[in-house]
Amino acid sequence: MDFIERIFTDFSEIHGDRAYGDDEAVACGMARLDGQEVLVIGNRKGGSTKDRVRRNFGMPHPEGYRKALRCMKIAEKFGRPVISFIDLPGAYPGLGAEERGQAEAIARNLLEMSRLRVPTISVITGEGGSGGALALAVSDRVLLLENAVYFVITPEGCAAIRWNDPTKKQVAADAMRISAAEVASLGCVDDIVTEPPGGTHTDHAAGAGFLGVKLKEHLAELQAMPMNRLVTERQKKFRNIAQFYTEV
């Protein structure tokens, strides 16, 4: 929300998924970027302990993903670009979330985002964890802040599973190649956003300034492209990420 408040104006939040409830870990609403109407999606981790618990430490429930998708379809109906901000360790894996269809909600977002007929941009501002992050990041442009990370599992979780030793988190992080430069080299993101010295958390205004410039540049490029080409290239990009090769 720090970025939304500093980069956009006239943010008007939309609540609820019209099916179960309103997930406070996910915020969606219409806003203006340099006067242009856009849909903004962001997740909230909370500040105080009480606030973090209320927002589930930033981990969305199914209703959070469904709320985001409902808003994306509204944006598509009115021809508004979609910009999402992601900083979450993953989707919430609790029993209630599974009973309400967490896997289906994530899969549905992946499908629908891949064919949205509006320009889409996703920004990973801190941590982008697994399918929970990808469910908000199937976009024409995926940006990654210079000090952010993008992974299929946290290094601690990987170390615990692979070696049964969470203290080997640095070994896991190195093997997983989760830094901005490494993720970009793998073709998983389209651009790295420069941060102020010490990181954006030390100077939110400067960090928002850097990111705002990038958003305007990429949005202008996307809006100059034919819609059929946008959708085709978006789908091709994510299919190519999934390709791998082996040597016999």
Name each model-derived stretch.
Residues 1-160, 164-167, 174-248:
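Terminal-region recognition feature
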